[in-house]
């Protein structure tokens, strides 16, 4: 029977060793940022309405629910002297992710075979599956290579790199339009050129970042793991059991990610139709199809596309805040404990989401992003730091994959029910979905205080 021995036998790693180990996450998160900031926009450009948007976003959590535990299970059992344990999954996932990043903004080019929306949903599924193949082993890699006293630092550095990648990805469409004059308001096209080229650049950076981690990171061999006492030589026959702490963290994750999902799906629509009182994109484009020279409709189209770019800026800002705040998390956690640190961050995130409803213009929307960025930094680091200390090393990958259930299930729940709620309870006003998300995150704050981990 296997017994987990002291994790302090793992070598202490330097800042730059941890940085290199997590650098691939910069590319992964740039891909996620492009998806989060532009998928709703692309889908509405292809003809989706606000009530059906959340249904398309079901693709992401469903693929994560299926893919991550499988990848975690097999990466725990994979070893190649040449390629390692987790790194083969990084590379294969990156290949398919880059393909999906190139294909999604070009979904309209395949309409001779299938409807554009169906093609877009298919490419979105490929993208999410590939992201998950690359992403899941990264969480396990940090826990594999770091002793327990460096877990918070490791996941915080990972969060900082996630933030940097997300800032670049979120800002990219705006930068291409405003700095390099790549157009964003061409009539008659489904997806604007600045968005398309942003996805191409994202694909290149994604692959480059993954390759950096592959070539710069060493993994412990099975023999080294036994020699250092990380795992026992004997095969485990213990009954598979999820620790109580993992269930408690799962409840926190449920309410946290429900709130985040509401923000990702509905911010663009809320900014356009609640803050600026614009007609739907479907209405604007239908009007231009009948009267292409209508000046009012043209100006509304331009403003709508500019606001779509601005959502990328807003998402980039909260990710930038998270990248900065991540460096302070280990210090704060040492002083107040991991649970209280995470609870405070979630409190700020819930406040920020509710605050978005009351902002009078796009510039004012920056203020709530500061609070959301603090919550995002903690969400990406603290649950994993708390979890890593209570699960066996030899099952790190599969447990991290199972823990992903508590991220994907709330997104599935939100995708199934938030659309009808917005339509029937909120009268089609997507801004109320942001308030609902904020309330859920406040519940996450309360449940975090029940977890007793220093």
Language-model regions, residue ranges each:
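Intracellular loop-helix junctions on the cytosolic face of multi-pass helical membrane proteins
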Residues: 1-15, 108-122, 131-134, 138-141, ...
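Loop-to-transmembrane helix entry/capping segments in MFS-fold secondary transporters
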Residues: 50-51, 148-158, 308, 391-403
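C-terminal ends and interior cores of transmembrane alpha-helices
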Residues: 90-114, 347-360
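Intracellular juxtamembrane helix-capping segments at the cytosolic ends
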Residues: 133-146, 378-392
